[in-house]
A protein has these predicted regions:
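Residues at the starts of beta-strands that form the adenosine-phosphate
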Residues: 40-42, 120, 195
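Short helix-capping segments at alpha-helix termini
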Residues: 37-38, 59-66, 89
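Conserved beta-loop-beta/alpha segment of the NTase-like Rossmann-fold superfamily
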Residues: 68, 74-138, 160
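Conserved alpha/beta core of the MobA/IspD/sugar-nucleotide pyrophosphorylase nucleotidyltransferase superfamily
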Residues: 74, 157-230
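Hydrophobic packing residues within well-ordered alpha-helices of enzyme cores
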Residues: 9, 54-55, 111, 170, ...
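Short, flexible, basic/aromatic active-site loop/helix in glycosyltransferases
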Residues: 132-161
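Short beta-strand segments
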Residues: 1-3, 44-45, 96, 123-126, ...
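N-terminal glycine-rich phosphate-binding loop and ensuing alpha1 helix
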Residues: 1-52
């Protein structure tokens, strides 16, 4: 999934096209999946106005990767629905954020293996910070706690991607009407009534959303290229 606009990044182009170790973030993300499975079918969802940009980029960098290019929708939900229209029955579908380039091939293969025997599997990481349930106050810079509403950190996990599903299940789930409560694919499939499995993700599988995220991703990429291993 690379149909986001990247408005929080404050850059002159969407964050999936920003440079990470000499390559576009999106190229690095796709390359990890190809390393995990060279025969994988890649469906790339992009903002309509950047499809030609991506084609030109791939040509100029000699990035040879058969891709099905799909126009993004008005929300992430609609973008995924557009992509699923190109997916056959009887397949495993990994829906991944194009701006999570630090996922490892080993984790991708593990998720596909787990999804063979369940409706879907979602990688998660435990929350390490103390969590607070807050509400806005009169000041834009200050929030206040909601009385009697406590968050138990031991029960809280952050969901990552790729989230992997049986194609029949996720395609049927995305046939439901859109709801603003759908924040990821797991929330859609859960609403459809399917019980999902969750497994440990990777702490470095960050989603590049802000300038600070890009700084961290560049530091990790540089360390890996110098020989450090995850």
């Amino acid at each position: 999934m690379a149909a986001g606009s990247g408005s929080r990044m404050g850059a002159d182009r969407p964050k999936q096209f920003l440079e990470l170790g000499g390559k576009a973030v999106l190229q690095r993300t796709i390359e990890v999946f190809l390393e995990a499975d060279p025969d994988i079918t890649v469906v790339t969802v992009l903002p309509e106005q950047f499809i030609s940009y991506w084609k030109d980029y791939c040509y100029s960098r000699n990035f040879i990767c058969p891709q099905i290019l799909v126009k993004g929708g008005i929300t992430r939900f609609h973008s995924v629905r557009n992509a699923l229209a190109r997916i056959p029955e009887g397949a495993l579908v990994a829906v991944h954020d194009g701006v999570r380039p630090l996922i490892t091939p080993a984790k991708i293969r593990e998720l596909f293996d787990l999804a063979e025997n369940c409706p879907g599997v979602v990688p998660v990481v435990p929350c390490v910070d103390t969590m607070k349930v807050l509400q806005p106050s009169e000041s834009k810079e200050i929030w206040s706690e909601i009385p009697g509403c406590e968050a138990d950190r031991s029960e809280l996990f952050g969901a990552q991607t790729p989230q992997v599903f049986q194609s029949e299940i996720i395609k049927a789930a995305y046939g439901m009407p859109y709801d603003t409560a759908f924040t990821d694919d797991a929330s859609v499939v859960s609403r459809y009534g399917k019980s999902l499995s969750y497994t440990m993700g990777e702490r470095l599988n960050i989603k590049i959303t802000t300038p600070e995220d890009l700084i961290l991703a560049r530091a990790v990429t540089a360390a890996l290229e110098e020989g450090y291993s995850l």
